[in-house]
Amino acid sequence: MTLRDYTANVISASKVVPDGAFQDSAASGVWDINEALDLIKGSNWPTTGNINPAAFVDNLFQIHIYDGNTTGTTATNQITNGIDLANKGGLVWIKRRDGGETASHHALVDTVRGGTKELATNSNAASLTADSSQNIAFNNDGFTITGYYLKNALINYSGSNYVSWTFRKQPKFFDIQTYTGDGTNGRSVSHDLGSTPGMIILKRTDASSSDDWQVFHRYATNKRWEPNNTDAGAATTLWGSGPTSTNFTVDNASFSNESGATYIAYLFAHNNNDGGFGEPGDQDIIKCGNYTTDSNEDATIDLGFEPQFVMFKRADSSTGGDWNVYDTMRGMQGDFLSQASLLEW
């Protein structure tokens, strides 16, 4: 008796060819591997419909916890998280979690500026360039770190533990734009987010700069926040009447549009039942909102999905509040302040 005969005798369910494509959960019947092969021979293999890997959040955002593996400048550490940075582009944000009393800068490295260019949300320094031997290489399934640091940030030091947050470029999720300032008040900068941004994080990057980071949030269209080494509250206008699905507007301040200066903007979408993600193509995966706590300083926020990454800041105080960062890998007890080099606490 062959294995096929044996299993056919044990499992006697009737084989009914499904009446729809693979992703259609309403299709009746079950595909049998041998029937599938027979259909291939007969050129009758079913269509896979419109399943798109970019529709799933796991292909667009990943949290990865890893251990550093070197104190030198040539050893590598390959981080495989399934994100295609080499072909699609995106941002890698790394932070050291431990290491005794030694704090470490945040490190933001993106595919637009390249793997040797470092920015830190806890610093107003310009884009810093690491030694060519130490860098981040962007792969089609993650990234590879060479060496133990970039310029100021430890990202792979042996004996320390790190978290990385990877955002892949994708319409209605995340985009990166760079531009050179022209000194115009009301300068319009185009983007490829394909929707109106929910949040924009902007930084001047040229060497002569010591300008603070600037943040737009849809909660307060005509305000700006500074997320680097300060917990300041909302400041005066920067963003004009607010961004659209094709562009955003900046004034001519040194931190936003000084003539000849260079800038980078990280754009985050806000889905409002129009994300178009997931297998059904009708799911949201990112939101930028606001909430009010009750008398017990509690609040429940219904996003419509289970978040992996949460960043929040008090918005109704002139003295501001910390930028708090949490994620599902470290849990709600693992807090980072994006404006500080402090270790996880």
Where does each model-flagged region fall?
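Surface-exposed molecular-recognition determinants
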Residues: 2-11, 15-345
